[in-house]
């Protein structure tokens, strides 16, 4: 899927990549089959607003309804490809995550229960300036619906601090919303104007850099505390790990990821290869990683 129809005030993507356009499901499935035949074990389905897959085309031919989710159909088709171990996707949009989509993620065994749902701000005033098309309450309602439909889920997000005219009150609303959700990880950016965007043209970059930096650090500290608590629940559990290879930080250890996209480090055993699925008993956790031992039958 290419392009974007959202036109957020700070983003250049719609101006450089054009409107949303989706590839046909058969073409995607054929590409996945070729990749799997070549040894690929995990597929990432990528789009600026991936849950809007097929929406533009459905609106053109008059088949779009509130229950429409061609992306759920795509997930089901890719899930049926033999030899594929896991399916990930990014990034969904608040307005295109309906019950059909949530049920597909829940029921399809190869689909990872990971949702990267960009927030950007917890302030309705700032969200409106950003042209994000949802309110903080609508965002939280979307998170609630997903959590109700899925017993175990990983949430990550994007946040911008220091957007033009952002006050301390606006920032604190963002901080509180992030605490309410409890994200597993977040990409937190300090605002900088992008040439050619509405925000660069119409809004003053009036938040001091030192204030942006401080707000960034506060959110990072909150995030680490929450992530450490979230990861602690995995201690003494057994997790299925898709092996990636030797750890970049410790050549004596190997690394892989859980279905919830948690990095897991472990000592290798004889015969292990990248792409294998192994069961690992988790012995220790941090805010960023899990550490365990492969269970040998």
Residue spans of the language-model regions?
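C-terminal, non-catalytic macromolecule-binding modules
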Residues: 169-219
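N-terminal pre-triad scaffold of radical SAM enzymes
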Residues: 1-9, 33-37, 41-44, 241
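Residues at the N-termini of beta-strands
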Residues: 10, 42, 86, 114, ...
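Conserved, mostly hydrophobic/aromatic
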Residues: 8, 28, 45, 89, ...
């Amino acid at each position: 899927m290419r392009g974007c129809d959202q036109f957020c005030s700070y983003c250049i993507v719609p101006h450089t990549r054009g409107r949303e356009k989706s590839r046909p499901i058969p073409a995607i499935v054929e590409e996945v089959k070729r990749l799997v035949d070549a040894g690929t074990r995990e597929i990432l389905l990528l789009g600026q607003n991936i849950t809007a897959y097929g929406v533009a085309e459905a609106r053109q031919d008059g088949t779009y309804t509130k229950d429409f989710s061609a992306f759920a159909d795509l997930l089901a088709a890719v899930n049926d490809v033999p030899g594929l171990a896991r399916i990930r996707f990014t990034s969904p949009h608040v307005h295109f995550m309906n019950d059909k989509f949530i049920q597909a993620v829940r029921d399809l065994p190869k689909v990872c229960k990971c949702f990267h749902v960009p927030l950007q701000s917890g302030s309705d005033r700032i969200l409106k300036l950003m042209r994000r098309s949802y309110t903080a309450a609508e965002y939280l309602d979307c998170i609630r619906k997903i959590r109700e439909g899925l017993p175990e889920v990983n949430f990550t997000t994007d946040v911008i601090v220091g957007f033009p005219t952002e006050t301390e009150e606006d920032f604190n609303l963002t901080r509180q919303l992030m605490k309410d959700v409890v994200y597993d990880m977040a990409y937190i950016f300090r605002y900088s104007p992008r040439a050619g965007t509405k925000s660069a043209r119409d809004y003053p970059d009036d938040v001091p850099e030192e204030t942006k930096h401080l707000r960034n650090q506060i959110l990072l500290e909150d995030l680490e505390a929450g992530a450490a608590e979230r990861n602690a629940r995995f201690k003494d559990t057994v997790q299925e790990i898709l092996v990636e290879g030797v750890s970049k930080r410790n050549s004596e250890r190997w690394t892989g990821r859980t279905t919830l996209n948690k990095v897991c480090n472990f000592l290798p055993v004889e015969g292990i290869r990248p792409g294998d699925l192994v069961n690992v008993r988790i012995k220790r956790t941090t805010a960023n990683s899990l550490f365990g031992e492969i269970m040998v039958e």
